[in-house]
A protein has these predicted regions:
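Amphipathic alpha-helical polymerization modules
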Residues: 1-137, 177-273
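Cysteine-poor, low-complexity segments in flexible/peripheral regions
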Residues: 139-181
Length: 273
């Protein structure tokens, strides 16, 4: 089969156009860092890219929730620590008040100190955060999603710390009144006070557990976020090594096609002469 000069010419033109397009595309990928220009370039990759973008927005939400819960639990822990210190001092004062040689007048003085400690505990229990929200929340306490399938309580409730089991302020008020009257705290008073301390300590333990769970969830979410970003990069970002190799190859093929065209032009010129 004989191939005409026109067929060779047309083939060379098509080859030049294709290689020029390949060069331009490789240059675009390298300069933009994006593997695809339009979603239609690879519908599957585009669809997966949308899913990955949604996943990234989810991890951004997790980060906001993590920061919120961390700030809340940090404030909770600080208030519980202050309450525990005040209660321990109150308990020590009760032990002192049970000392028989102390006398009625000295117990009344202890009653004044007990009132100051009770007021301090009340202030700690009703403290507010920087946003004006009570650190010990009204029940029920809300939860927040801090990692995939991981929800944590955002705080502790006031009732959980101050009311459930023993009413902390009521117990303190009763004992303070006993001391203010010059009387010695009873065995029941001592038992109630120990129960109050146990109740607050239990709240501290729970806060610590929530903080540990938050740390673990934050670390897990960060690892998953990194994996999602890696998937996105592998799917949508330019592979510089591959794109550079493609550019070199396409440039070489384009130059070869241009050389063929030049020879065709020369041959055509000689034929005309």
């Amino acid at each position: 089969m004989r191939i005409s000069s026109q067929q060779v010419f047309d083939s060379s033109v098509q080859s030049m156009q294709q290689h020029t397009s390949d060069v331009v595309e490789a240059q675009r990928q390298i300069s933009s860092g994006q593997k695809y220009r339009l979603a239609s370039d690879d519908a599957l990759a585009a669809g997966l890219g949308v899913q990955i973008a949604w996943d990234k927005s989810q991890f951004a939400m997790f980060k906001v929730n993590q920061d919120h819960v961390n700030a809340s639990l940090t404030s909770t822990d600080a208030q519980l620590n202050s309450i525990n210190i005040a209660l321990t001092k109150f308990q020590q004062m009760m032990v002192q008040g049970r000392n028989d040689p102390l006398g009625s007048d000295n117990r009344k003085l202890l009653g004044q100190q007990a009132m100051a400690l009770k007021n301090a505990v009340s202030q700690f229990a009703n403290a507010k955060d920087a946003n004006g929200q009570s650190i010990f929340r009204a029940a029920p306490v809300s939860t927040a999603l801090v990692a995939p399938s991981v929800s944590l309580e955002t705080a502790l409730s006031y009732d959980e710390v101050m009311v459930t089991g023993q009413n902390v302020l009521s117990v303190m008020s009763g004992i303070q009144a006993t001391l203010a009257a010059g009387n010695s705290p009873t065995d029941t008073d001592m038992a109630n006070m120990q129960a109050v301390l146990t109740q607050v300590t239990r709240a501290q333990v729970k806060t610590g557990l929530l903080q540990n769970q938050l740390d673990a969830a934050t670390e897990s979410a960060e690892v998953q976020k990194t994996n999602v970003e890696l998937q996105r990069s592998n799917l949508l970002d330019t592979d510089l090594a591959t794109a550079t190799a493609s550019l070199v190859k396409s440039n070489a093929l384009l130059q070869a096609a241009q050389s063929v065209m030049t020879k065709l032009d020369v041959n055509t010129l000689f034929q005309k002469l």
